[in-house]
Amino acid sequence: MDIEAFDYHLPEALIAQTPLKNRDESRLLILGRQSGYIEHKHFKDVTDYLNEGDTLVLNDTRVMPARLFGMKEETGAKVEMLMLTQIEGNDWEVLLKPAKRIKVGNKLTFGEGKIIAECIEELDQGGRIMRLHYDGILQERLDELGEMPLPPYIKERLDDQERYQTVYAKASGSAAAPTAGLHFTDELLERIKAQGVNIAFITLHVGLGTFRPVSVDNIDDHEMHSEYYQMDEATANLLNSTRDNGNRIISVGTTSTRTLETIMQSSDRFVAKSGWTDIFIFPGFNFKAIDGLITNFHLPKSTLVMLVSAFSSRDYIINAYNQAVASEYRFFSFGDAMLII
């Protein structure tokens, strides 16, 4: 398929620059997966569309303050490093800016030497594998020196760093938030549980793919970047019993969706599993895991627009996006949401 099929016009003014005061007061577009039917609600109304016995699957990853500003040890030249994925031990895949002059063997220093990063492998498009040297616990060094890695389309400074975390964020390791989850409050989750809906958690650490646009004209030629995921036995058992009882599995976000569908590609039942996934979901994909999807509005021509188009249809999704634009919904990470069901 041609990538232009997943384009739509978005006025820049509709890109949300800051979160709303109250998470669950964002707008919610309801889209009938099979019919294309559209309804306009608010996120706190999501309870009207969840049934007793359904299971809501959330990604409990936590965003690291993974943007570091430092200098090249040899020259003192300024450099920015965005930590993306832990490869093994202290070796991390990162994005550097500028990257051109950072070669294997070069060292970068951050916080007057509190973190030193040595380049051990050069990748394309500004990517590098860096070996980190530091005293103590890395998370503590990042909390001290790092900044939250907001997407490039957000120009405003974030006053409260926790607003780029879900209220249930737990497992540190992401370079970006699973943004569909940003709309939930503790109170809303309690209301959902009170009506007999199950809450389940998986983990997928959001990595490089979030920051890289599709660079091919034919989407069949696109290759996804790998991201680490895990699901425990308790969650697998809950999802299997949900399915056995004839109830629905509602995925919160494309990251939860990619995790669940990865696991179900090699099995007819949910199983406890961890590993790396590069699953690319686009129209024609056979969904085996989910019955509904809560997701934000995504960038034109992105793999995430392709994923939601696969779950519903390209025509229904583009029509819904165009209606959202006409209704002045807020787009992207701090924007509004849609429920496809």
UniProtKB/Swiss-Prot annotation:
Gene3D superfamilies: QueA-like (3.40.1780.10). The keyword S-adenosyl-L-methionine applies. Keywords: Cytoplasm, Queuosine biosynthesis, S-adenosyl-L-methionine, Transferase. The keyword Transmembrane helix does not apply. Pfam families: Queuosine_synth. Pathway: tRNA modification; tRNA-queuosine biosynthesis. It comes from Staphylococcus saprophyticus subsp. saprophyticus (strain ATCC 15305 / DSM 20229 / NCIMB 8711 / NCTC 7292 / S-41). The gene is queA. Belongs to the QueA family. Monomer. One of its GO terms (cellular component) is cytoplasm. This is S-adenosylmethionine:tRNA ribosyltransferase-isomerase. Transfers and isomerizes the ribose moiety from AdoMet to the 7-aminomethyl group of 7-deazaguanine (preQ1-tRNA) to give epoxyqueuosine (oQ-tRNA). One of its GO terms (biological process) is tRNA wobble guanine modification. Its EC number is 2.4.99.17. PANTHER family: S-ADENOSYLMETHIONINE:TRNA RIBOSYLTRANSFERASE-ISOMERASE. It is found in: Cytoplasm. It comes from the Bacteria. It catalyses: 7-aminomethyl-7-carbaguanosine(34) in tRNA + S-adenosyl-L-methionine = epoxyqueuosine(34) in tRNA + adenine + L-methionine + 2 H(+). GO terms for molecular function: S-adenosylmethionine:tRNA ribosyltransferase-isomerase activity. InterPro entries: QueA, QueA_dom1, QueA_dom2, QueA_sf.
